Each structure stands twice: as C-alpha cells, then as structure tokens.
C-alpha cells in the first residue's frame, strides 16, 4: 500500500510538471551610466501582441517574469522618469531593448539594432535576456 501511495504521488508530480502552460523569462538590464534608473521592463508576444510588464527598482539588474505563455517574444524597457533629451532638446524617457547588437557585443561593428525575438517554452526557463541596447533600439515614442 505504501508503494502504491508513493507511485501515485510521483505520478501526480510528473503530470503536473508536464502540463505546465507557461514558462519563465530571466534576464538583466544594463544602462550606460554609473547607475541603473528605475524602469519598466516589457515582454511582447509577437503573435498576439499581448504585453507583460515588470517594474525594476533603481540599480536593480536582474529581472524574472513568471507564468509567461509559450510563444515568441521581444523584450524592451523604458525608464520611469524623463532622463534623456530628444532631437528637439525636450526631456524624454529613455528606451532600450534586447537587440541583435547585444549578443554581437554592442561594439561599433554591431549595426543591427532590431529587437531580437526569443522563444518561451512551457515548463522551461528562458535565460540571458539582456536589455542592454540603449543606443539604437527603435520603439514607440512612449511606453505601452
């Protein structure tokens, strides 16, 4: 009887882990300054356009999104406060992203600043999403 209970318990754990309908996304934010400003980090599903957001405190580097549905995503961030100046010399919030330039090394030779699509898989953790390109990531003028 004891062995049957153990078998049923282990089977339920296995079924629960196999039926996961979401994944986790872990990464870091960088900022070209001596500190990291408070910001909002976003994941956008490429198929549904649904956006997930997370608040990052000042000088916080790591972030973690839980229960993100499987799919293809892009990651980007906007500062909470206006800390940059636009082309018209007007204060603006800054934005950055996880772009093709990030895995390239963010050097002068890295010309592709388009957002990099990554996959979230059910029951898995997608790691190393680095929102570090604050010089060429092209996004909307305002945060979602």
Segments (PLM) and residue ranges:
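Positively charged n-region of N-terminal signal peptides that target proteins for export
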Residues: 1-4
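A short, amphipathic beta-strand motif
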Residues: 23-31, 131, 141-142
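Short beta-strand segments within Ig-like beta-sandwich modules, predominantly Fibronectin type-III
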Residues: 53-58
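A short, solvent-exposed beta-strand micro-motif common in secreted/extracellular proteins
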Residues: 71-87
